[in-house]
């Protein structure tokens, strides 16, 4: 890997006067710079990105576990409600003569309330999962963008120096001088 890097560095110092070589003009070599920056970001950012994704995965799994615990609690509540329903049904048999319609209404209300509670908990679980997933995606995007920007700035700063600026300005002055004549 070091030899490949050294070969690209040595190619960058070849004279650009009418032969093969790298053009160090940043405006003319944008695809080359972008490919180098992307290569650096991919090479060095892969580990960080994997760590971020692993951490995010653990958080999401933790959220899923919490949601499953909430689901289990809802199931337990449902079982308690069913037990209560069975109790109400036995009482209904005892009081069938006196108030069958009122007991049936209570049964339906109990079933409806339990179903709504279970549905609300399921919606909460789904919303939590979606929120965590979106937050993870946004954090990964932000981290990749920051790393790409830092890599690009580092590459630009390492490639630009005062001698390069002086040569570029001199070349442009020469071109303008030729254009005026």
Curated annotation (Swiss-Prot):
Transmembrane segments annotated in the record for this chain: 27-49
Gene Ontology terms: cellular component: chloroplast thylakoid membrane; proton-transporting ATP synthase complex
UniProt-listed Pfam families: ATP-synt_B
Subcellular location(s) per record: Plastid, Chloroplast thylakoid membrane
Main location: plastid
Superkingdom per UniProt: Eukaryota
Molecular function terms, GO-annotated: proton-transporting ATP synthase activity, rotational mechanism
Membrane-related topology note: Single-pass membrane protein
Keyword Transmembrane helix (UniProt): yes
Sorted UniProt keywords: ATP synthesis, CF(0), Chloroplast, Hydrogen ion transport, Ion transport, Membrane, Plastid, Thylakoid, Transmembrane, Transmembrane helix, Transport
Protein family membership: Belongs to the ATPase B chain family.
Function according to Swiss-Prot or TrEMBL: F(1)F(0) ATP synthase produces ATP from ADP in the presence of a proton or sodium gradient. F-type ATPases consist of two structural domains, F(1) containing the extramembraneous catalytic core and F(0) containing the membrane proton channel, linked together by a central stalk and a peripheral stalk. During catalysis, ATP synthesis in the catalytic domain of F(1) is coupled via a rotary mechanism of the central stalk subunits to proton translocation. Component of the F(0) channel, it forms part of the peripheral stalk, linking F(1) to F(0).
Note: In plastids the F-type ATPase is also known as CF(1)CF(0).
Subunit structure: F-type ATPases have 2 components, F(1) - the catalytic core - and F(0) - the membrane proton channel. F(1) has five subunits: alpha(3), beta(3), gamma(1), delta(1), epsilon(1). F(0) has four main subunits: a(1), b(1), b'(1) and c(10-14). The alpha and beta chains form an alternating ring which encloses part of the gamma chain. F(1) is attached to F(0) by a central stalk formed by the gamma and epsilon chains, while a peripheral stalk is formed by the delta, b and b' chains.
Record PANTHER family: ATP SYNTHASE SUBUNIT B, CHLOROPLASTIC
This protein's name: ATP synthase subunit b, chloroplastic
